[in-house]
Amino acid sequence: IIVGTGTCGIAAGARESLRVLLDELTARGIDADVAEVGCIGMCYNEPLVDVVTDDGEKSTYGHVKVEDVSKIVKEHVIGGQPIEDLLVPQDGFFDRQVRVVLENCGIIDPESIDEYMSKGGYKALKTALTEMSRQQVIDKITASGLRGRGGAGFPTGVKWGFVAREPGPEK
């Protein structure tokens, strides 16, 4: 069971729904994996709760109120029957989206460095620190086209090149 607890979910009441969910599972003696994830990407449907079955079938519930939680546990988690009137319609919202930077958003716990690393997080940093020279890093950043966010969009690799050529240990 996945509960979106990004700022949008929290503002919509996700923490309360999560608390009631955990209490409900405990009271019924259900040993389910419950994960908190960052924003799932449908802020307008928060709080969002995904129920994923053992065979990988995912049902997404939207606008989950505290009073809906018991019904979701009883009918879906225990009974195996999704509650149609609480499900988020499959309208193709995500179909044409390609997530790059935020590909794991709504999938992993944003407060778990281990989950981030299990998805390849910090791999590029490790490579830069252990396998590349300073100039190779600058060349890679330059080739990427990465630009600053200060308004002018100045090329980051060019800036790093300027700084690297300056004398002295502090940059």
Residue spans for each PLM region:
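Feature of Fe-S/electron-transfer and energy-metabolism proteins
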Residues: I1-K171
